[in-house]
Structures are given as structure tokens and as C-alpha cells.
From Swiss-Prot:
Belongs to the class-II aminoacyl-tRNA synthetase family. Type 2 subfamily. This is Aspartate--tRNA(Asp/Asn) ligase. Homodimer. It comes from Methanoculleus marisnigri (strain ATCC 35101 / DSM 1498 / JR1). GO terms for cellular component: aminoacyl-tRNA synthetase multienzyme complex; cytosol. The gene is aspS. The record marks P81 as: Important for tRNA non-discrimination. Binds 3 Mg(2+) cations per subunit. The strongest magnesium site (Mg1) is bound to the beta- and gamma-phosphates of ATP and four water molecules complete its coordination sphere. Mg(2+) 3 binds at E352. Residues 188-191 are annotated as: Aspartate. It is an enzyme of class 6 (ligase).
Length: 429
């Protein structure tokens, strides 16, 4: 019976393993293979004078990244990976890999990002790359468990829609029989509708689509968003929920993914609560102290401004009290100063991670705000209808999973945090 490589210890007497040939070395009287599965790497040592001829013949024909089965005696060897090796009694090539390889899984020869993504299945065999996606999986599992523990219902909303969430042109049109349709930018409208349904607290982890022409290290055209909406809550309530989630996820990864963090050479620090709350006007002042292209009140924050503020704050933080005119139509204005709204962004020192707000729950005010944005309320009738039949006060946010993983692991490019990225220039594989 096959053992995962991690389960083979120096105390194991014999073992059968199956995995990929990571490296092949020939030192005259000895041949060495490094065999890899998703749990680790083990050395297979072939003393040429002590193994059957058929094993030697098979060993000579093995190419890197071929899949092999090895059964043999385990010996404790201090200098070998994991302090043990296998001397084979059986060696079988299950699947042969062509040579040369499109890229070097052992990473002795580096590869450009495009080369890596063109052969992502092979790139993902690298222990370092695999560690990123084990951690990403841990992030989403921890977030799901945390939100369920807070009473949130996991929902699934349409990704093919008839209207834009926020208007604008950042839409992917698709052929949908005789109708006009688009890929959804956000589950925003649907999660608000579930507040009218009485679900009270919901979340979704799913894809979002933005037809942005950005081609940067932090933008994707298809991304994964963690969205939350809570009834009978204001912006402060959901900011607290968001920072609790961030701290919980970091803590979970630090405790449960130590091996993968070590592979990435990361000493993960868990953020401290509460995160600072910085008013938008103050954030502009902080940024303008150091950036060359100064911002005026009412401007959105540039990447340079985000970095400048992040350098000053040095930790996760919220930007709050945004000008109403530059936030989505559904953001609730302050009653006593309607030029500002109850919106916020969660920031990492490197970039924005999340955006949220208390939402408008009054039908007439919402229609007024939609019109003020130059949009047609008639186009949003399906969304507005629930607001006529008892919509509770509510608030929520959306959090980018790729950006969360990217900043957590200090990755240089957001494409490192998604298996098969979709950007302006990449549609395959």
C-alpha cells in the first residue's frame, strides 16, 4: 500500500511510495533519485552493485518529472532529506515525462511568469508554488468556518446578470440567447436582496469579473471575492467583523500552515486589533506629504498614495468617512453631513484589500442616489423592488481573496495567488 512521503520516517522499515522524479543524480557507483509527492520529498538510493539488473535498467531510463513507484527498504541517513532514504527492491515507471521540460520544477533554472503560466500544471508542482495554494485553501476554509460560527449563511448568487452592479463600462458582455447579459462584477445587489429575504447575515466566496484594462501586478479580470452582508448592522459593526476575520485567518494560517510558511521562508505575524481608522481627509493629507502627484479632496487614492499611507501607518488600517460623490450609490450618507458617507476601505500597507459600507435601506433615497450617479432607476427595478417591502438597515463588504493571500505571503505579483489567471492578455490555459 502506498504511503505518503511525509509518513515515511527514519524508523519505517519498508515503504512503497509513488510520486514524481524531482531530481536524478549519478555518482558512478551510486544513483540517486529525489521523489516528490504533495507531502514532501524522499531520496531513493540505488547502489549499482547491490540491486537487481532490472532496477538498474529502469533507473537509467527515468526522466525528471516522470511518475514512478518505488518499494524498498528504508534506512536512516542523516544527510538525506527528512533523515531517511529508500533502497529500492522494485522500481516502476508509471508515466514518462518528455524531455526537455518546459520549465525546471526544481527551480535551479528560473522561468519568467508567462513561461510559468503557459505550463501552470508543471509550475504548480514546485513545492514553493504548492505551498501558496495550500495556504490559499487554508485561508478560504478558515474564513468559511469563522463566518459560519458568526451565524452567516453561505449563499450562491448569479454570475450571469442583466444589469451592472454599479453601472459603468467595466463589463464583460456575453451572448445569452436573445437577451443582453453580462458577467457579474459583484454579488452586491443579490446579497442586499437577501437582507430583504430575512436571512440577516450572509456570505459568499465566488468569482467576480471586471473588464478593466489594467495590466499590473495587482489587477485581474477574473478574481475571487469574499462578500458579507449583515442586517441590523452599521458600518462600524461590519468593520469589526472584518478585522476579526482577518486576525482569525492569519492566526489559523500561522498555526496550521507552519510547514508551508517555512517553504516560503515567511515568519507570519498576526495583525493586532483594533485596526486604525483614518478619515479620508486625513489620508489625503498623509499621502500628500510624500507623493509627487498631489491629490485633491474628492480624488480616489492612487497606488502611490496607498503606499505612502501604508508606509506611515505600517499595519492594516481602515480609511473611513469617504466623500459620498466618489462612492457607490448604495453607500449610506451621514444624516448630519450628507457630503460624507458611511463607507470604508480596509487597507494593507501595500494596497486596498476590501471595500464596504452601511447601505441605504430607504427606497426613495436609493432611487435619488442612483439618479444622481447618472444611472436609470428603471434598469435596477429588480434590485429596487425589495426596498418597497420592508428592507432592514444593513451593511457589508467585499474582500479580494487573491489580494489577501498576496499581501499575507508578500508575493510580488497577484498572479502567484491564482492558479489560472485571467488578465487582459491571458485567456489560456
Amino acid at each position: 500500500m502506498r504511503l505518503p512521503i511525509r509518513a515515511v520516517t527514519p524508523e519505517t522499515e519498508s515503504a512503497e511510495i509513488v510520486g514524481w522524479v524531482h531530481e536524478v543524480r549519478d555518482l558512478g557507483g551510486l544513483s540517486f533519485f529525489l521523489i516528490r509527492d504533495r507531502t514532501g520529498i524522499i531520496q531513493v538510493t540505488i547502489p549499482k552493485k547491490k540491486v537487481p539488473a532490472e532496477i538498474l535498467d529502469t533507473a537509467r531510463s527515468v526522466s525528471r518529472e516522470s511518475v514512478v513507484r518505488v518499494r524498498g527498504t528504508v534506512k536512516a541517513i542523516e544527510k538525506a532529506p527528512g533523515g531517511r532514504e529508500i533502497v529500492p527492491e522494485e522500481l516502476e515507471i508509471i508515466s514518462t515525462a518528455e524531455s526537455p521540460l518546459p520549465l525546471d520544477v526544481a527551480e535551479k533554472v528560473s522561468a519568467e511568469m508567462d513561461t510559468r503560466l503557459d505550463s501552470r500544471f508543471l509550475d504548480a508542482r514546485k513545492p514553493r508554488v504548492r505551498a501558496i495554494f495550500f495556504i490559499r485553501s487554508a485561508v478560504t476554509c478558515a474564513a468559511t468556518a469563522f463566518l459560519a460560527s458568526r451565524g452567516c449563511i453561505n449563499i450562491a448568487t448569479p454570475k450571469i446578470v442583466a444589469a451592472a452592479t454599479e453601472g459603468g463600462t467595466e463589463l464583460f458582455p456575453i451572448a445569452y440567447f436573445e437577451k443582453e447579459a453580462f458577467m457579474n462584477q459583484s454579488p452586491q445587489l443579490y446579497k442586499q436582496m437577501m437582507m430583504a429575504a430575512g436571512f440577516e447575515a450572509v456570505f459568499e466566496i465566488g468569482p467576480i469579473f471586471r473588464a478593466e484594462e489594467h495590466n499590473t501586478v495587482r489587477h485581474l479580470n477574473e478574481a475571487t471575492s469574499l462578500d458579507v452582508e449583515v442586517s441590523f448592522a452599521d458600518h462600524n459593526d461590519v468593520m469589526e467583523l472584518l478585522e476579526d476575520l482577518i486576525v482569525h485567518v492569519y492566526d489559523h494560517v500561522a498555526k496550521d500552515c507552519s510547514e508551508h510558511l517555512a517553504e516560503l521562508e515567511i515568519d507570519l505575524k498576526v495583525p493586532s486589533k483594533p485596526f486604525p481608522r483614518i478619515p479620508y481627509a486625513e489620508a489625503i493629507e498623509i499621502a500628500n506629504k510624500t507623493i509627487e502627484e498631489k491629490l485633491a479632496f474628492g480624488d480616489d487614492l492612487s497606488p502611490a498614495a496607498e503606499r505612502a499611507i501604508g508606509d506611515t501607518v505600517g499595519q492594516h488600517y481602515f480609511i473611513v468617512d469617504w466623500p459620498t460623490d466618489i462612492r457607490p450609490y448604495y453607500a449610506m450618507p451621514y444624516p448630519d453631513r450628507p457630503e460624507f458617507c458611511k463607507a470604508f476601505d480596509l487597507m494593507h500597507p501595500r494596497m486596498e484589500l476590501s471595500s464596504g459600507a452601511q447601505r441605504i435601506h430607504d427606497h426613495d433615497l436609493l432611487v435619488e442616489r442612483i439618479s444622481a450617479k447618472g444611472l436609470s432607476p428603471e434598469s435596477f427595478e429588480f434590485y429596487l423592488k425589495p426596498f418597497r417591502y420592508g428592507m432592514p438597515p444593513h451593511a457589508g463588504w467585499g474582500l479580494g481573496i487573491e489580494r489577501l493571500v498576496m499581501t499575507m505571503l508578500d508575493l510580488p505579483n497577484i498572479r502567484e495567488a491564482v492558479l489560472f489567471p485571467r488578465d487582459r492578455h491571458r485567456l489560456m490555459p
